[in-house]
Each structure stands twice: as structure tokens, then as C-alpha cells.
Amino acid sequence: AFAQQGPKYVFYFIGDGMGVNQVNATETYLAAVEGRRGIKPLTFPSFPNVALVNTQSDSHGITDSAAGGTALATGRKTYNNAIGVLPDSITPITSIAVWAKDAGAAVGIATSVSVDHATPACFYAHQKHRKMYAEIGRDLVKSNFDFFAGSDFLKPAPLTSGEADLYTQARNAGFTIANGKE
């Protein structure tokens, strides 16, 4: 009798601003480049598990990356500009990444933007406004996640005198910071 094992790795890819129409347009374009009609399928729509999520914000018909990221990370809606908090702007919402970490999984966040930008921040931070970069950076340091990769912090300077910058805080929390080709 073999016990069923869970997956070894789970990857959660987010195409920021990408919906079904953008995927279809890309597939149509790729076919046209080859001189044919129809579509040339992308790989990811044929993954074994694919989900469509409505990320409309609680405050607007058109969402922003903060509310959309919060919906993707937590399954809950919030207002535009909110990072990981309910519409009351105070109550934190637990993300799927935190659930995974609490269950014993190693968790990493990789992004093409800064690590304290709206979409990646929704997986570890709880702030009332997406531009609270220093506070979001503090949340990153306290996250206990295993890995972050991105294009730096947007506001690494300390918020108050006597406080260390985010690089020092991250190193003190056990993170190794690599710049360039390190």
C-alpha cells in the first residue's frame, strides 16, 4: 500500500494584466507569423491544472495590481491600492503562500519587478496602500519565506532614525542578498 504523496513543487505563475483575450490574441498572432489562420497554442493553457479567476476589485470595475494580486493570493476581494487587507484597510488576509509556509513548505517569490511591488507583495504583506514600500519591505523581512528574487527594494531606506535599512534588516533575518551576477 503506497501512501499518496502531494506534489513536490507548486509553481503559481501570474501573467499580470493577462486574461483569456490576451492569450487568444497571442495564439492568433503566433499562427499569423507562420502564415496560417487559426491559432498556435501556447504551452501553459495545456498544463494539467489551470484556473481562471475574477480579480475585479471591491471598489472599482477595473482592478489594479494591488487588489488583483490580493484576490489571486488570498481568494478575497479588496479595494484598489490595498495589499493583503480586507476593505476595512486594517484586517490582514492570509495568502496561499503563508498557508503553504505554515504547512511546512518552502516558499519563494520571484518577480520581474521590485520585490516590494504590488503583485508580489500581496503574498506576504498587509498594507493599506501599495506605495507604502518601506512598510511592505518590513513585511517581507518578517515573512519567514525562504527566497525572494526581483529587482531590488523601491524604498530600502529606514523609516525612522535609529532603524536599519531594509538590506540590513533582511540580512539580520537570515536572507542573503545578491546584487548583479553574484
Where are the language model's segments positioned?
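N-terminal catalytic scaffold of extracellular/periplasmic and nuclease hydrolases
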Residues: 2-182
